Amino acid sequence: MIRAFGRDDRLAVMRLLRLMHQETVYSRNEVNWTKVRDRLDMHCGGYERMAGFVGDLDGDVAGVLLVGCGENWFSEQLFGFDVVFYVRPDRRGMLLGRGLLRAFEAWGREKGCCQVSIGVSSGVMVERTGRMLERLGWGHSGGIYRRDL
């Protein structure tokens, strides 16, 4: 079941974020878990232009999508963006990702966004994730390039 992320989900989402950090290119970066916890509060009702969704399978939070919306740089039109999109490895391919994306799209429409976007920047299953997004009607519009300093 896909539902809104709430304060009671913070511990479960923190566990997911720890897994995400270990699995992805972000494992090279330091983490301030107190800051992460505080940022989670922004996505569970703390800010009008931020939201979150969780994939809950019988009380087991196995996926999370944290999102926001803001004005386009060129105009006042709103666009939606993801902050975190993660599904636990043992639950991938079980429609959780699709459900989270659909919730994001609905939220974006409700907020008046003209567009929503998802970044595939984790370095994990990039091609597979891209194919899923394209099957669901999302278009590829670029890439992310990194250089460690």
Descriptions of predicted regions:
Residues D41-V54:
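A short helix-loop-beta-strand connector motif used in the catalytic cores of GNAT acetyltransferases and
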Residues V83-G93:
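A short, internal acetyl-CoA/4′-phosphopantetheine-binding micro-motif in the GNAT/acyltransferase core
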Residues M1-R15:
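A short beta-loop-alpha structural element at the N-terminal edge
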